[in-house]
Amino acid sequence: MFSGSGAIGLEAASRGAKEVHLIDKSAQTFPILKQNIDNLGFADFCFCYNSDSYSVIKSEKIKSKSFDIIFIDPPYCKEMIPEVIKIVSENNMLSDDGIIVTKIDSIEEVYEGYQNIELIKKKKYGN
């Protein structure tokens, strides 16, 4: 979620992910994301959505899926991660052995989890 040009998701695709869903609402970066998918020949299993991440993960098409890895990379200092994790948890979108990887600014509070999703490890890089 909050995919930008798709670098993280496309790296997962290049390493064997069977299906990748990339969400970004930016009118500036979405065409780049789409072009990157096409350039890499991943259009058959990489699906991109030019919309608000919350709306997409609440949609019937997505919320019925179970994911092994979910990357959440929202704009810094927006406190968006708790709501995303709540939606993922309430819709059982994370597989039993799945993981969520998030990235936040160092001034943001680390989110400890929600219901069946809990923080296992945190690392600090940079500021």
Model-inferred region functions:
Residues 1-127:
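Class I S-adenosyl-L-methionine-dependent methyltransferase catalytic core
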